[in-house]
Amino acid sequence: MAPLPPRGLVPSLLWCLSLFLSLPGPVWLQPSPPPHPSPRAEPHPCHTCRALVDNFNKGLERTIRDNFGGGNTAWEEEKLSKYKDSETRLVEVLEGVCSRSDFECHRLLELSEELVENWWFHRQQEAPDLFQWLCSDSLKLCCPSGTFGPSCLPCPGGTERPCGGYGQCEGEGTRGGSGHCDCQAGYGGEACGQCGLGYFEAERNSSHLVCSACFGPCARCTGPEESHCLQCKKGWALHHLKCVDIDECGTEQATCGADQFCVNTEGSYECRDCAKACLGCMGAGPGRCKKCSRGYQQVGSKCLDVDECETVVCPGENEKCENTEGGYRCVCAEGYRQEDGICVKEQVPESAGFFAEMTEDEMVVLQQMFFGVIICALATLAAKGDLVFTAIFIGAVAAMTGYWLSERSDRVLEGFIKGR
């Protein structure tokens, strides 16, 4: 059993501090573990190769800027001609191509380092675009702009304007992807060259297409007005060149459960739960029930709760009935409590005496003070020679002492003995 803290503010604080410091070091000094990082998707190899080439080109600019720029022009030109295509410059550039934590870049650089050296010393003149030569032609990780897939096929809409300029060709520039066009809002078709559902052609020429939104519920239209509708969206019907809402609740389209009712909404419908009082319903509330649930009864046009407590439904001794919505429950009557399935009378705790909350030490101090006062009073009365008042006082003290000892006899006697 854990030790109880001492009484008093200062002793309690010292006790808590000693308990805290008694804990083993790893328990209260060890920091909480860091959260597990979420898994990171690996980039496409083409994207890694493009980043490598971009950093390579930045390195070329950096090495020229750091080594030359300002001074003797003739001397710089002579030195630059030697440094420009030197192995020293290549090493300096390659050292800064990949960041320390970019493992994909380091792996790709290790695989392609000989190709980069070959391009640096022998192929720069015939293939000045390192990205095209390395990533597309040599490693075959990428495709030219506007193409996709293992064979670098043209994206829908052509390589000049993939997806008509109104969408994104999936896998463009890589050896992967499907080439499917993900069109912008309002555009559709295989190459995003048409207006999508709910839009109409506001402007079109050989290189330009503007799609604007139709009136709310229109699926196809010739203009922005309500009367321009040609076809309506699902949940609407064309009536006199206008789209009107279909009330699905009056058709077989609505499929609600047995204890639900249908509510029509714009272009659709909702199924909502019947009231608790209903066993099937035609709408909200206890007045729209088809039948009443158990615990309810028909009163006029509504299903209302039955008060089961009007009849004797709680046979147990000292039980009483409490009505609930659609039912009832049996609980113990006031002054009783549940115990092992039956209601038993609650025991009222006896009121504590005057000395009930006092500790042993406090009793000893009080006892010593009490008897000290008695001895002092007796000595004073005896010194005055007043035998009558002395006798009365001794009798009163004896009566009080007898009552006190009857309440706390064991503890007082023990304290008295210890006090002596």
UniProtKB/Swiss-Prot annotation:
It is found in: Membrane. FU repeats lie at residues 208-255, 268-315. The chain crosses the membrane at residues 363-383, 385-405. Residues 384 are cytoplasmic. It is a multi-pass membrane protein. A motif (CXXC) lies at residues 46-49, 278-281. Glycans are attached at N205. Disulfide bonds join C46-C49, C155-C169, C163-C181, C183-C192, C278-C281, C309-C321, C314-C330, C332-C343. Its main location: membrane. Keywords: Calcium, Disulfide bond, EGF-like domain, Glycoprotein, Isomerase, Membrane, Redox-active center, Repeat, Signal, Transmembrane, Transmembrane helix. It comes from the Eukaryota. Residues 153-193, 305-342 form the EGF-like domain. Expressed in myoblast C2C12 cells (at protein level). Residues 1-29 form the signal peptide. Residues 30-362, 406-420 are extracellular. Protein disulfide isomerase. Promotes the localization of acetylcholine receptors (AChRs) to the plasma membrane. Belongs to the CRELD family. PANTHER family: EGF-LIKE DOMAIN-CONTAINING PROTEIN (PTHR24034), PROTEIN DISULFIDE ISOMERASE CRELD1 (PTHR24034:SF114). This is Protein disulfide isomerase Creld1. It comes from Mus musculus. The gene is Creld1.
